[in-house]
């Protein structure tokens, strides 16, 4: 990675991705996974299961006028 690149004037220079000082060390990237995920065994579970119910109306009422006409 430290291969010098040639410029137009014939001068040798380092590639732009290298640091200015050769003695500079790369800083380690911070570990973003510091907070461990909770395991499935430790998660709280409820004593009762949740039941979801919904009603489906087969005959849909489009307008109130149509409902009045159907009843007559």
From Swiss-Prot:
Residues 1-44 are annotated as: Disordered. Pfam families: SPAN-X (PF07458). InterPro entries: SPAN-X_fam. It comes from the Eukaryota. Belongs to the SPAN-X family. This is Sperm protein associated with the nucleus on the X chromosome N1. The gene is SPANXN1.
């Amino acid at each position: 990675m430290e291969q010098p690149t040639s410029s137009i004037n014939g001068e040798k220079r380092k590639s732009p991705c290298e640091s200015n000082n050769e003695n500079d060390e790369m800083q380690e990237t911070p570990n973003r996974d510091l907070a461990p995920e909770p395991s499935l065994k430790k998660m709280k579970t409820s004593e009762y299961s949740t039941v979801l119910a919904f009603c489906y109306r087969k005959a849909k009422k489009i307008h109130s006028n149509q409902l009045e006409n159907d009843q007559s």
